[in-house]
């Protein structure tokens, strides 16, 4: 693309600047090829002429569009170059306070030098399980990606953290390890993750120090491998260390410190255990005072010492070993204070009894003289002899320092080995994630051996990094099948060869170290001779012969040769080491030096796999022939090279992830960005190299759909095809002519660097042109509108002026016209009056004359008409008379003629009738004649009828005309009379008119007078009325004001009291909720510890019961004992479950619940305290009313109960006495009155009497119960029964009892029983049975009517609901209802069948009993009675009907069937089948009915065992299927129902208010199960928490996709295209959830809970928790995703929330508190949509966002990103204003909401109206071994 197309007017470029590195400027005119100068304008408004380089003609780099500024990924920038990268990092760091940014596969982390709240556990949970491209850049995102790729690809991972000292490498590595420890639990050993984290404070204390650049700088490199098992849980870790900076032990530069551990020891010197170390202030010791900065601001070394010791203890370092470590460290400090005195130039000595050396020897346990001798001497060995040589003071000091460094290095390695042993696991490692905390590229004014090794390591790492980046780039191209060429990138291999190849720098250094007289100078000369002018990367400084320069990938570095050989050899005298090894009092010291040679050997690595790199070879005193070890000759450089090769092999075998830490400034100022320092580090850490590699290929990638959506504005309508891919191709070919600038892949379009910016420029130009056109149109419209407004104003003025003139002229014309009209009307009146008189006279004459003529004419016409009528009638009469006469004559003639003809014919017929043939012929003719005659008769009849009708019509017409003529005559006569009267009337009226005119004139005169007086009176009256109204209004106003004041005061007082009461109530509720939450958290913690205890116990059993030969046994991991309960929410439990299920279970002894109950005492006290608080609150609210209600309600109920109990007790006692007396008297009477043979036992009469007596006794018991029930009802329902009836009933009962007693006293009981009583009893029993059957039938009919009514209501409701549903939902609802109806009918039929079966079985059983009794009776009679006696005394058997006993709502089972009951009812029960086919809560009812029977039997052991087994069974089911929502919901519902049953039937008054009398009879009588209710309540809380976890696990994957990512409102894009975001995840989305998915899941949850019969209040709490999870997860992701913070996304979120609110309304759950949990999300969405410019906007935001914390508000404003370039970003000054306004707000500094928070749950008492005695046990449950009682 030509430069002239890009470098146009308004284009922005970057130009170099000495201060800011790069400055932004804008072109003032287009660039043309050949121009030497660019006309620019800087951002501050200064114009500048920028001269181009005449040689290269290189133009300044272009600036990216504003829409790309602040991107999460640097490679998403269209122009990829240094200034763009620097500017993007600066904007994110300074403006948005974002310290993390992606650069391809690299995470760039800038040290903020400030504590940020972005590393808490809530942030870890937010990033856990998320795709890397979905969240904002973070170290946790990199760690999650590594963890996910390890689990998915089953490949080891590495996280390489590098950067300068002080850039934050150690902190980043520490947070990465913390993330792994948090998201994955330990597999076998306890607290493995805690041990991994505990290694950090130990390694920081012994390996970190304060430098000029960093207060906590790591002075060694480390690679930590975190091991995972097959389930990807942490099982251990392993650490490798690299190149410890030992020189810091003996020397520190200005403003630096030694290692932290020394200062921690000095700060803790006052501790009693440290007295023996004889430490003091750090300034006392030579090794800690050289830097002059012993204290770090904000760091307490004493506290850090405590943390270090705690970490050592956690890692298994015993107190004795810890004290040994501290003794060695203290000895090093004292050794540094040892001073030497010179004897001469070649010898020195230590003063006798030198205190520092004495302390050192005491601490080390070595001989003072021996150590003092070898510090001042050394042993030399030749081929023939060995001799001791004194050394100078300088050499002695160097030897002392070398010894101190060697001791510290060995101690460091020992601690590392011990840490590795503590982190080592016996479980086989499946995979690992390595975290490499390595030093970055370093260059100082003086660079020595340490910087050389560091830069060498960075060259190797950079080479590996370049290859990995290149590989990923090419894989993407190959995947999309686009042609690509080899990308040229910087190759580090030449530099690496210069360092490590044969005859390289390290090789020559090692060779020089082997030379007896080798020196730094000779080594430098060898380097010059070998590489100078032969290797382009090697140079020699101009002014030095003791230095060399290497061109590294980042920069040129000049190394000083001085000290290279000494540091490479790192020699320490062996005699000093032998003295330390000889220590007998100190066990740790010899351990540091034992097997030193073995430790150095690469073939004898430590068990942890660590490669020790800082071991120092010990120089032997004498080289023995044949035993010279090559391992002792290995130098530090050689060891480092080998370890680096091992490290690279490890990294190459893993998938690397890169973190580059940047130090923003050298002064540690928070959020201060130094461009110069940042550019240096960006060049050194490879970020710019990544940019260069990306820029060489196709850095910008767009999907076809995104490209089409973004650049649709550049297309014409004819270019848009149905095939989006082809459309994009056609458009690109027109927009970008150079086809090399883009490539078409399978799913994406790849662009070269700068092409997206070019397209954005074209798009912006197009939109700018459109905007200009819109502006032109709008401005024209505004000017037109202004002109029209002015024109309308002018016209209005003209109209008013002309109107005034016209009105004046109109007034003149009106007056003139009025005068003319008055004249006209006056003249017209006179003329009209004269004319009217003449006209009236003429009309009157004409009327009279015309009337006279008309009357004459009328009379003549009337006479003529009457004459014609008379003539007509006369003529008609004459014609009729003549006709009748003629007709009569004709008929007579015809009759005569016919008579004659008939006679003749008769004669013929008589003759013919005598022959048969004639008769036949006649017969045939007669038939035809008869038919013809009949036809003629019919015709004549018809004709007669028609003539008759005509005659009638003529008569009617005649009569009508006659009446009409009569009326006409009458009317004419009347008209004549009226005309005469009118003439007379005219004359009289004329006279009256004249008279009235006079009266009218008088009346008009009077009227004027009256009107004048009335107007005056009216005016006065109106004035008076207005004055009265004003006074009345004032009085009303005053009255209203006073009333308003009184009302306001009353209202204010009321509101104050209500507000105070509400505040107190809220405070009490908060305290109650806090206490409840604290208790439930403790319960949750107890469950977790219990789970942990069970797991450890199972593991211990598993370890103990190792299979032996010939005997195979596997312990169960599922225990059936006690109250074990676990929540399987992690991947580890889910994967462990199949393994546990396969193992056989082993029965254990049941838990004694008394132990668990003792643990609940504290819980009971807390509940009582909460109850007292609640009671106090209730008393404050409704004290008077509630007290009065209680006084009215309690006495009658309590009195009725007491009366019933006392009556029952008295009746029982009296009946017992009566029955005893009766039996005695009866036996006595029988003995006295009957013969011995009759009354002997076994006799028939005796048996009959005894049977009758038994029957009567039973009947009396029945009567007694009826009387007691009646009496209790009379006492408790006095208002329903009249006193008189009460008295009669009681009297009747008393009389009945008195009669019975009299009969007993008289001795007539036998005859009464045999006679009358028997008859009465039979009649009463028959009557009772009939009455009962009638009542049952009536009750059944009522039940059927009620059920039919309910069914009708349900059908009507269903019909109403169906009419509101769409057709598909209507069909589905109808089917569901039909299924429910059929199921209920099926259940009813099953119940009826069961009842009938039971009745049949009962009848059969009674038949068998009766048959058996009859058989026994017959046998007894045959044995005891002779035949004669049988004949003489026949005994008639008496049929005694028994009353069938009602069910008592209990279930009986045997003790040995308890486990079977738990197994069938709990363990193997399928919730779905029970919930669909049976009544809700059936298992709970069954269990309670079993408890009732055990209580009825007074068997405490049975009650305890059943309840314990039930609780354990429920826990076992939830442990086995705890991740199934239906199972958890089912048992939560049943547990609550079981708890409610225990309360409802406990017998406590508070729970019996809603019971029926029958239900009160079912209350428990022998046991108080209040403690078990507490246990069940705790169990319900645990199940509820498990239910919440299951809900969370199901909803979690849906929330972000459905609430944030899915575009619910079509046409409104809430996020940028991925082409602008660039960063994508390594894992493709498996499925996209929408808001409908969430709502469908909510519907599923709600329907399942309703189906299980869960309490409505509990459902509301579950829904509230679900909505809290949705709101918290959505808000947390919003706060961590910059791409989601836009205006359109806020609108999408608000719409989604409204849909959730609509769901709440549909389910009638708006009062559940769920909507309030969404308030933070709603306010966040509103914050994205409101204006964010002025102070008024800031005030509105502060008042609106009261549910968001200050941190959240500021975070949203910082993250706000416009979706397109026409939106404005939030200014930094506006954010500062918000912070100032919210400064006084007291809220949590926490950024994210706690998505794991669970609201405290309560279980309000919900009694059941279901009668226990009506519950049937379905056969499908397999509970045939229990029976109803």
Curated annotation (Swiss-Prot):
Molecular function terms, GO-annotated: actin filament binding; ATP binding; ATP hydrolysis activity; calmodulin binding; microfilament motor activity; minus-end directed microfilament motor activity
Biased composition (Basic and acidic residues): 1137-1148, 1170-1196
Biological process per Gene Ontology, one example term: protein localization to plasma membrane
Complexes and interactors: May be a homodimer, which associates with multiple calmodulin or myosin light chains.
Name of the molecule in the record: Unconventional myosin-Va
Catalytic activity field: ATP + H2O = ADP + phosphate + H(+)
Region (Disordered): 599-635, 1106-1148, 1170-1199
Keyword Chaperone: no
Domain annotation Dilute: ranges: 1508-1784
Keywords, sorted A to Z: Actin-binding, ATP-binding, Calmodulin-binding, Coiled coil, Golgi apparatus, Membrane, Motor protein, Myosin, Nucleotide-binding, Phosphoprotein, Repeat
GO cellular component term, pick one: membrane
Purpose of the protein: Processive actin-based motor that can move in large steps approximating the 36-nm pseudo-repeat of the actin filament. Can hydrolyze ATP in the presence of actin, which is essential for its function as a motor protein. Involved in melanosome transport. Also mediates the transport of vesicles to the plasma membrane. May also be required for some polarization process involved in dendrite formation.
Domain IQ: 767-789, 790-814, 815-837, 838-862, 863-887, 888-915
Residues reported to bind ATP: 163-170
CDD domains according to UniProt: Myo5a_CBD, MYSc_Myo5
Residue stretches in coiled coil: 916-1239, 1315-1419
Region (Actin-binding): 644-666
Pfam families assigned: DIL (PF01843), IQ (PF00612), Myosin_head (PF00063)
Modified sites of kind Phosphothreonine: 1734
Domain Myosin motor: 69-764
Tissues and organs where the protein is expressed, per its UniProt entry: Neuronal and non-neuronal cells of the brain.
Gene (name only): MYO5A
Subcellular location: Golgi apparatus membrane
Myosin N-terminal SH3-like domain residues: 8-60
Positions with biased composition (Polar residues): 1117-1131
């Amino acid at each position: 693309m030509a430069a002239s197309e890009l470098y146009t007017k308004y284009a922005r470029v970057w130009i170099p600047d000495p201060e800011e590195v790069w400055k932004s400027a804008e072109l003032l005119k287009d660039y043309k090829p050949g121009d030497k100068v660019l006309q620019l304008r800087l951002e501050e408004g200064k114009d500048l002429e920028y001269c181009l380089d005449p040689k290269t003609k290189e133009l300044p780099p272009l600036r990216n569009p504003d829409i790309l500024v602040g991107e999460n990924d640097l490679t998403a920038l269209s122009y990829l170059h240094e200034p763009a990268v620097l500017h993007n990092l600066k904007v994110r760091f300074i403006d948005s306070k974002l310290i993390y940014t992606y650069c391809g596969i690299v995470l760039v982390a800038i040290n903020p030098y400030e504590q940020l709240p972005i590393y808490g556990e809530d942030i870890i949970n937010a990033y856990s399980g998320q795709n890397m491209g979905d969240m904002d850049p973070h170290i946790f995102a990199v760690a999650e990606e590594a963890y996910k790729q390890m689990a998915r690809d089953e490949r080891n991972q590495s996280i390489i953290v590098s950067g300068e000292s002080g850039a934050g490498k150690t902190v980043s590595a520490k947070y990465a390890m913390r993330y792994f420890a948090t998201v994955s639990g330990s597999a076998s050993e306890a607290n493995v993750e805690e041990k991994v984290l505990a290694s950090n404070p130990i390694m920081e204390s012994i390996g970190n120090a304060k430098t000029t650049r960093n207060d906590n700088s790591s002075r060694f490199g480390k690679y930590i491998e975190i091991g995972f098992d097959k389930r990807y849980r942490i099982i251990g870790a392993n650490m490798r260390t690299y190149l410890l900076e030992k020189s810091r032990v003996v020397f520190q530069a200005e403003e630096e410190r030694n290692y932290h551990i020394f200062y921690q020891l000095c700060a803790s010197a006052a501790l009693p255990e440290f007295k023996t170390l004889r430490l003091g202030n750090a300034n006392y010791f030579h090794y800690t005072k050289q830097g002059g900065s012993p204290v770090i601001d904000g760091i307490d070394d004493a506290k850090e010492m405590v943390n270090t010791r705690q970490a050592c203890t956690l890692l298994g370092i015993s107190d004795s070993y810890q004290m040994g470590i501290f003794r060695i460290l203290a000895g090093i400090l004292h050794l540094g204070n040892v001073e030497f005195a010179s004897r001469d130039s070649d010898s020195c000595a230590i003063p006798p009894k030198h205190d520092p050396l004495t302390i050192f020897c005491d601490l080390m346990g070595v001989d003072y003289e021996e150590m003092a001798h070898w510090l001042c001497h050394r042993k030399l060995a030749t081929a023939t002899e060995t001799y001791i040589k004194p050394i100078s003071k300088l050499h002695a000091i160097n030897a002392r320092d070398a010894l101190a460094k060697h001791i510290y290095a060995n101690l460091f390695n020992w601690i590392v080995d011990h840490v590795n042993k503590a982190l080592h696991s016996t479980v086989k490692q499946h995979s690992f994630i390595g975290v490499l905390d390595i030093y970055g590229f370093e260059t100082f004014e003086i660079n020595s051996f340490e910087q050389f090794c560091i830069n060498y390591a960075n060259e190797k790492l950079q080479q590996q990094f370049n290859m990995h980046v290149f590989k990923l780039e090419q894989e993407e191209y190959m995947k999309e099948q686009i042609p690509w060429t080899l990308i040229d990138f910087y190759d580090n291999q030449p530099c690496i060869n210069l360092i490590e190849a044969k005859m390289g720098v390290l090789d020559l250094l090692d060779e020089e170290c082997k030379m007896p007289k080798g020196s730094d100078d000779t080594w430098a000369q060898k380097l010059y001779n070998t590489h100078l002018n032969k290797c382009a990367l090697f140079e020699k400084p101009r002014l030095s012969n003791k230095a060399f320069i290497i061109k590294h990938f980042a920069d040129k570095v000049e190394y000083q040769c001085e000290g290279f050989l000494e540091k490479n050899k790192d020699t320490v005298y062996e005699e000093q080491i032998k003295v330390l090894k000889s220590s007998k009092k100190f066990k740790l010291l010899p351990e540091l030096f034992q097997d030193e040679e073995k430790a150095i050997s690469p073939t004898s690595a430590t068990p942890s796999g660590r490669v020790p790199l800082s071991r120092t070879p010990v120089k032997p005193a004498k080289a023995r022939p044949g035993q010279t070890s090559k391992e002792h000759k290995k130098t530090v450089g050689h060891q480092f090279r080998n370890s680096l090769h091992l490290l690279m092999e490890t990294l190459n075998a893993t998938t690397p992830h890169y973190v580059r830490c940047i130090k923003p400034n050298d002064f540690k100022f928070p959020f201060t960005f130094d461009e110069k320092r940042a550019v240096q580090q960006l060049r050194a850490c490879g970020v710019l190299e990544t940019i260069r590699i990306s820029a060489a290929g196709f850095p910008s990638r767009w999907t076809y759909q995104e490209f089409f959506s973004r650049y649709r504005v550049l297309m014409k309508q004819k270019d848009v095809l149905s095939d989006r891919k082809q459309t994009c191709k056609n458009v690109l070919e027109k927009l970008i002519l150079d086809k090399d600038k883009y490539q078409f892949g399978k799913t994406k379009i790849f662009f070269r660097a700068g092409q997206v910016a070019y397209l954005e420029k074209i798009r912006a130009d197009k939109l700018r042109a459109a905007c200009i056109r819109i502006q032109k149109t709008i401005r024209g419209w505004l000017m037109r509108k202004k002109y029209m407004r002015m024109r309308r104003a002018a016209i209005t003025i003209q109209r008013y002026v002309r109107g005034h003139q016209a009105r004046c002229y109109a007034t003149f014309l009106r007056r003139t016209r009025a005068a003319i009209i008055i004249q006209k009307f006056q003249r017209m009146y006179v003329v009209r009056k004269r004319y009217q008189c003449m006209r009236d006279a003429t009309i009157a004459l004409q009327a009279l004359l015309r009337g006279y003529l008309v009357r004459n004419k009328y009379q003549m016409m009337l006479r003529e008409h009457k004459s014609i009528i008379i003539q007509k009638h006369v003529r008609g009469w004459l014609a009729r008379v003549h006709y009748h006469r003629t007709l009569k004559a004709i008929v007579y003639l015809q009759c005569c003629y016919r008579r004659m003809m008939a006679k003749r014919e008769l004669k013929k017929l008589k003759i013919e009738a005598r022959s048969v043939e004639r008769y036949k012929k006649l017969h045939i003719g007669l038939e035809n004649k008869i038919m013809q005659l009949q036809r003629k008769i019919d015709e004549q009849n018809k004709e007669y009828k028609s003539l008759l009708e005509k005659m009638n019509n003529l008569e009617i017409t005649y009569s009508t005309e006659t009446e009409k003529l009569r009326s006409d005559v009458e009317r004419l006569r009347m008209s004549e009379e009226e005309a005469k009267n009118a003439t007379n009337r005219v004359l009289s009226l004329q006279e009256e008119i004249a008279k009235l005119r006079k009266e009218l004139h008088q009346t008009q005169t009077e009227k004027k007078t009256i009107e004048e007086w009335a107007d005056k009176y009216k005016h006065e009256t109106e004035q008076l009325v207005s004055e009265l109204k004003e006074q009345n209004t004032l009085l009303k106003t005053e009255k209203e004001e006073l009333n308003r004041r009184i009302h306001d005061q009353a209202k204010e007082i009321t509101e104050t009291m209500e507000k105070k009461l509400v505040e107190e109530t809220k405070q009490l509720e908060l305290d109650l909720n806090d206490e409840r939450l604290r208790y439930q958290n403790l319960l949750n913690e107890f469950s977790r510890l219990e789970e942990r205890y069970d797991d450890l116990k199972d593991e211990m059993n598993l370890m103990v019961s190792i299979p032996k030969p010939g005997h195979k046994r596997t312990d169960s991991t599922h225990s059936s004992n006690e109250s074990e309960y676990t929540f399987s929410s992690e991947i580890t439990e889910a994967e462990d479950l199949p393994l546990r299920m396969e193992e056989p279970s082993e029965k254990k002894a049941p838990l004694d619940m008394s132990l668990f109950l003792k643990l609940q005492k504290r819980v009971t006290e807390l509940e009582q305290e909460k109850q007292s608080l609640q009671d106090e609150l209730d008393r404050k609210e409704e004290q008077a009313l509630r007290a009065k209600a209680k006084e009215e309600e309690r006495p009658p109920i309590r009195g009725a109960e007491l009366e019933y109990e006392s009556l029952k007790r008295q009746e029982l006692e009296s009946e017992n006495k009566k029955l005893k007396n009766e039996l005695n008297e009866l036996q006595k009477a029988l003995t006295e009155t009957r013969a011995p043979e009759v009354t002997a036992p076994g006799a028939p009469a005796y048996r009959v009497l005894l049977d009758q007596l038994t029957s009567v006794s039973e009947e009396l018991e029945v009567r007694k119960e009826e009387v007691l029930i009646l009496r209790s009802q009379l006492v408790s329902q006095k208002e329903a029964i009249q006193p008189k009836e009460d008295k009669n009933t009681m009297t009747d009962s008393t009389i009945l009892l008195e009669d019975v007693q009299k009969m007993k006293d008289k001795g007539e009981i036998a005859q009464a029983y045999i006679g009358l009583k028997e008859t009465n009893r039979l009649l009463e029993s028959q009557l009772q049975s009939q009455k009962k059957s009638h009542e049952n039938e009536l009750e059944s009919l009522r039940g059927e009517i009620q059920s039919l009514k309910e069914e009708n209501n349900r059908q009507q409701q269903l019909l109403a609901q169906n009419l509101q549903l769409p057709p598909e939902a209507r069909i589905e609802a109808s089917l569901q209802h039909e299924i429910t109806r059929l199921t209920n009918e099926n259940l009813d039929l099953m119940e009826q069948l069961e009842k009938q079966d039971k009745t049949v079985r009962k009848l059969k059983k009674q038949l068998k009993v009766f048959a058996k009794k009859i058989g026994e009776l017959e046998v007894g009679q045959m044995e005891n009675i002779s035949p004669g006696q049988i004949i003489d005394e026949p005994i008639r058997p008496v049929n005694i009907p028994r009353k069938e006993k009602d069910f008592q709502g209990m279930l009986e089972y045997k003790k040995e069937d308890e486990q079977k009951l738990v197994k069938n009812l709990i363990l193997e029960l399928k919730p779905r089948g029970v919930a669909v086919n049976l009544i809700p809560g059936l298992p709970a009812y069954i269990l309670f009915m079993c408890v009732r029977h055990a209580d009825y039997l007074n068997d405490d052991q049975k009650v305890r065992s059943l309840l314990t087994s039930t609780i354990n069974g429920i826990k076992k089911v939830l442990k086995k299927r705890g991740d199934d929502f239906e199972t958890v919901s089912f048992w939560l519902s049943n547990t609550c129902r079981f708890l409610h049953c225990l309360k409802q039937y406990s017998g406590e008054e508070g729970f019996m208010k809603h019971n029926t009398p029958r239900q009160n009879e079912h209350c428990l009588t022998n046991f108080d199960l209040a403690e078990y209710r507490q246990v069940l309540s705790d169990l319900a809380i645990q199940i509820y928490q498990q239910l919440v976890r299951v809900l969370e696990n199901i909803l979690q994957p849906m929330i972000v996709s459905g609430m944030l990512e899915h575009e619910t409102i079509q046409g409104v894009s809430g996020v940028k295209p991925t082409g602008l975001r660039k960063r994508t995840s390594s894992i493709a989305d498996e499925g996209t959830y929408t808001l409908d998915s969430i709502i469908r899941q909510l519907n599923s949850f709600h329907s399942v809970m309703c189906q299980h019969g869960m309490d409505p209040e509990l459902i509301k709490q579950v829904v509230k928790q679900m909505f809290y999870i949705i709101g918290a997860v959505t808000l947390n992701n919003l706060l961590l995703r910059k791409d989601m913070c836009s205006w359109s996304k806020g609108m999408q979120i608000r719409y989604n929330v409204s849909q959730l609110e609509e769901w709440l309304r549909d389910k009638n759950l708006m009062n559940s508190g769920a909507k309030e949990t969404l308030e933070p999300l709603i306010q966040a969405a509103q914050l994205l949509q409101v204006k964010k410019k002025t102070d008024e906007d800031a005030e509105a935001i502060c008042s609106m966002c009261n549910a968001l914390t200050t941190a959240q508000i500021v975070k949203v404003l910082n993250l706000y990103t416009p979706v397109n370039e026409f939106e404005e970003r939030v200014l930094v000054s506006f954010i500062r204003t918000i912070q100032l306004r919210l400064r006084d707000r007291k809220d949590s500094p926490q950024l994210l909401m706690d998505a794991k928070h669970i609201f405290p749950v309560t279980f309000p008492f919900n009694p059941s109206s279901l009668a226990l005695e009506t519950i049937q046990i379905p056969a499908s449950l397999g509970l045939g071994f229990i029976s109803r009682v």
